[in-house]
Amino acid sequence: MNDLCADIGYKSINHVGEQLCGDHVDIVEQGDGSTVIVLADGLGSGVKASILSTLTSKIISTMLAAGLPIEECVSAIAATLPVCSVRGVAYSTFTIIHLRNNETAELIQYDNPQVILIRDEKNFEYPRTEMNIGGKKIFKSVIKLQEDDLFIAMSDGCPHAGIGMSYNFGWKREDIAAFMETICVAGYTAKTLSTILIDEVNKLYGGKPGDDATACIVRIRKRVPMNLLFGPPSNRDDCDRMMSLFFSKEGKHIICGGTTSSIAAKYLGKPLKATLSFERSDIPPIAEIEGVDLVTEGVITINRVVEYAKDYIEANTEYAEWSMKRDGASLIARLLFEEATDITFFVGRAVNPAHQNPDLPINFNIKMNLVKELSECLRKMGKHIKVSYFYGVRNHEKIRYQGAVPQVQGASRGRARRVEPHAA
């Protein structure tokens, strides 16, 4: 079984003075375990470029995902794109990375900077075949994937950075490759790598980008399962069953909540060791149970993780905060955002009497909403999510399972796609 998966992340900066980005990235997951990633760069900048790039990426990704050949995609783009009233042309460059079951990558490139492949921590020169489709020179490559392969797709705003300032002729492709070689060894996620690259591009522009710039990074890695337990079941008789299912799962185990951790400690026959050292005044301290990878408080900690997750899939400005700190929320964020690819939530639906105080901004619905929000954010990152809710039912014991959270529509900012379904 292929246990590789693709961690996909991207970031863009706009041309100075523009509200919209003229680059667009679209990602479509296919039912056969394949993924189509399209980075399009519209002619010029601003609204017109945004329309051109969005149409291009949407048309190509949708048609390729449906199994249509690239020739038909290019013809459809030529017939669909609106013509620029100033230049008299309809034009958008594009880069396509088509991952087939995470075994091979098909690269199709038209007028964007050539995709960089970092393999074994070095810039790897791969073969390219030239095609002529509708008068357009298009390059195609087919590459067999290896673990730790790193694909770097860019719009031309990246190599143009620093022209006339730091560099006479811009930040050349080989210089960008050398820069990425030095940081890829740190094991950063694709989202973090794209953020580092675009931040460097922005510096070379002196904080005033002369063009839209986008970096989309695909990192090939092994699948990593992880399990998070949040709250006890509403039926006390289901505690042992819930714990048995939770601890039988492959991967690391995270427990959130005071009552939940006490039940887990009793089930394991191990002491619950609370720590009184506050890493942060606004996040409760963590605890320890032998056999459990991380034990934290519940609602307050998870609420902060949700805040981090929302920022991570957008601007990723809070990375420096949670990537280094040792509080419960930061530790959970690192495990879920950076390490895990397949995450199973075990959610108990017991009502905590302490949360029924009308003076507290915490109630049962907030707890359930936190699970929903976090699950949706993680899916936007490309994680494979399964949520199991534990209900108590009169006259008989029953555990009700809710399957994977529905796919959230819209392009994501950071994704890590699984290869095979994660068994319940």
Task: Identify the meaning behind each predicted range.
Residues 24-78, 152, 164-177:
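Primarily the active-site beta-strand->alpha-helix module of PP2C/PPM metal-dependent phosphatases
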Residues 33-45, 109, 144-167, 218, ...:
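Conserved beta-strand-loop-short alpha-helix elements that form
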Residues 1-20:
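Regulatory cytosolic signal-relay segments
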Residues 160-244, 248-250, 270-405:
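C-terminal catalytic subdomain
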Residues 18-31, 125-163:
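Acidic loop->beta-strand submotif enriched in PP2C/PPM serine/threonine phosphatases
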Residues 103-104, 248-253:
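Short active-site oxyanion
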Residues 21, 52-121, 138, 190-218:
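Catalytic core of PPM/PP2C metal-dependent serine/threonine phosphatase domains
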